[in-house]
Amino acid sequence: MALLQISEPGLSAAPHQRRLAAGIDLGTTNSLVATVRSGQAETLPDHQGRYLLPSVVNYHASGLTVGYDARLNAAQDPANTISSVKRMMGRSLADIQNRYPHLPYQLQASENGLPMIQTAGGLLNPIRVSADILKALAARATEALAGELDGVVITVPAYFDDAQRQGTKDAARLAGLHVLRLLNEPTAAAIAYGLDSGQEGVIAVYDLGGGTFDISILRLSRGVFEVLATGGDSALGGDDFDHLLADYLREQAGFSDRSDNRLQRELLDAAIAAKIALSDAEAAHVEVGGWQGDITRSQFNDLIAPLVKRTLMACRRALKDAGVEAQEVLEVVMVGGSTRVPLVRERVGEFFGRTPLTSIDPDKVVAIGAAIQADILVGNKPDSELLLLDVIPLSLGLETMGGLVEKVIPRNTTIPVARAQEFTTFKDGQTAMSIHVMQGERELVQDCRSLARFALRGIPALPAGGAHIRVTFQVDADGLLSVTAMEKSTGVEASIQVKPSYGLTDGEIATMIKDSMSYAEQDIQARMLAEQKVEAARVLESLTSALAADAALLSAAERQAIDAAAEQVRAAAAGDDADAIKEAIKNIDTQTQEFAARRMDQSVRIALKGQSVDEV
C-alpha cells in the first residue's frame, strides 16, 4: 500500500508502474544510497565504483565539492571543509562547543541560538551541509535509476531525539527529497537480514563505525521493533584503531618528529592499509617513510584489545538497561566497517555466546535495510509480502458496555494520527476500567478483531458517571498504535502498544470491509438493541442505588408503581425488541420523576441546613 495512495485493499492506482525509491544511510563518517532492482537490494556506486561517499563537504567561493574530493581538502583548507556534521544535527551552538571544543570551523549563533558555520560559501547551518550530502547521494541514485526519486527512507541513530530527527527531515526537503520515513539504523540492519519476519525475541545491533560505537538492544514482537536500550561511545571507532597502529608503526620505524604532518598522513594511510590486510591475512608488510617491516594480526590484536573491551562494557550496560541477559539475545547484527576486524567479531561472539551475522557487508547493511523499506513504502511490494500502514485499513476503537464497539479512528485515516474520546464509569464506586482495543467495521465486539486489553486502575470512587477517562489512540508513521487511558482528575494512566497490521493479510482486510457492508442493516439493528439494553441496565442500577438511600420518600403506592415499572424494564431487556425496551425505559422515567424531584429537594435542604438567606 503506497504512502498517501488511498485505495481499497487489493487495488492499485497503477499496478504496472514501478516507482523509484532509495534508502539512504546518512552516516557520520560515510554515507551510502541503495535501491531495490529486480527484487534485490543493492548499494549504488559512483563512477569510480566506490560505494561509500565520505560525509564531507568543502565550500569555496565558486561552489562546493562533496565526498572524496572534499576530503582531500581537509588538511589544507580545514575551516571550509565540514565533516561529521551529523554530530551537530539538532544541537545548539553551546552544546556543540561543549561537546566538540576543538572543531576547526568558525562557529557563530543564529538569532535562535542555532549553530552557523562561517565558510567561503557563506554562513551555513548543519541542515544545509547535510542537504548537500543528500543531494550528492540523490544525484547518484537518479542517474543509476534513470529517473527522479519518488521517495526515500533515511536512517538515523535510535537515540536521535525529535530535534535531530526533524533536522534530518528538513535537510532532505532542502535537498528536494520526499521523505517516506525516518528509520532507526539498528532496525534497518535487522530488516536487511530479514529479522523483521523471523523469530520473535531480542536482537542486538553492534555498530562500530569510523568515529563512533553504538549498541542497540531491540525486541521484535508481533511485527514491531521496540528499542529496549541504546548505548555506546561517541569517541570510539575504527579511526582509533588506525591511530594506535600508526603510533606503533612510528615507534617501530624510529620516527621521532611528530610535527611532520605529511609523515603522519603516510603513517595513517599505511596503518589503514595494514588493518584491512590483517582482516584476511595473519601478517601484513608495511613500507612507510623509507622504513619497511611486518606486523602480525596478533600484534594488532594486542593494540586494539582494550578498545574492543570498551565496546563490550557498553554492551553490558545496554543489556542491563534493557533488563535482559546476553544469552537471551537471539541474533547479533554487525554494522560498520570496523566490524570486519577479526578480533571484534571473535570477542562479540564470545560475549553474546553466538556467531554474529556478518554475511551482508557491514558498511552497506543499514542502507540495504532502508532500501527494502523504501521499496515497500513507495508501493512496489505486493501487499501479500508485507503490509505497512500509511492509511488505516480498518477502523480502531474500544469495547463499550453491552459488547459494542466505539470507533475512535475510522478506516482510511492517513497516518500519523492521534484521536481521543472521553468515557465515564458505569457503576457507583467503580475504581478500575478494562480497556479492550478493537479493530474492524462491525458494530459488535464479537464481529471485530481483538487487538489488546489492559486495565486502568486507581480511578476515584465516585458515583456512576462521575469519573472521566480520556482514551487516546495514536498511530505513528510506522503503523504502531499506542493507546493511553487517563483519569482526568488524578492523572493516573495506563497504556499499551500494538501493531494493528500484524498478522492480517490484504484478503482478510477486504473480507472484513465487505462483511461490514453486507451486514450493515443487521449490525445497526443489533447495535440499537444492545444500546437499549445498556441503558436499561444503567437505569435499573441507578434506581437500585436511589431506593437504597431514599425509599422513605415514597408512599407504598408510589413504591409499588416504580417496582412494577422496573420489572417491565427487566422483562423487556431480556427480550430482543429494542422499541419495547425504549418504551419501558420511558415509562420508568415517568414513574420516577416525582421521586427524583423529592431527592433533589432533600439534598438541597441538607446542603443549606444552618445557613441564613444572606449566606446563600
From Swiss-Prot:
Q: Which organism is it from?
A: Klebsiella pneumoniae subsp. pneumoniae (strain ATCC 700721 / MGH 78578)
Give the keywords, sorted: ATP-binding, Chaperone, Nucleotide-binding
Q: Which PANTHER family match?
A: HEAT SHOCK PROTEIN 70KDA
What InterPro entries does UniProt report for this protein, alphabetically?
Answer: ATPase_NBD, Heat_shock_70_CS, HscA_NBD, HSP70_C_sf, HSP70_peptide-bd_sf, Hsp_70_fam, ISC_FeS_clus_asmbl_HscA
Which terms does the UniProt entry file under GO BP?
iron-sulfur cluster assembly
**What family does this belong to?**
Belongs to the heat shock protein 70 family.
Q: Which domain of life is it from?
A: Bacteria
Q: What is this protein called?
A: Chaperone protein HscA
Q: Does the keyword Chaperone apply?
A: yes
Among the Pfam families in the record, one is: HSP70
- Report the GO molecular function annotations: ATP binding; ATP hydrolysis activity; ATP-dependent protein folding chaperone; unfolded protein binding
Function text: Chaperone involved in the maturation of iron-sulfur cluster-containing proteins. Has a low intrinsic ATPase activity which is markedly stimulated by HscB. Involved in the maturation of IscU.
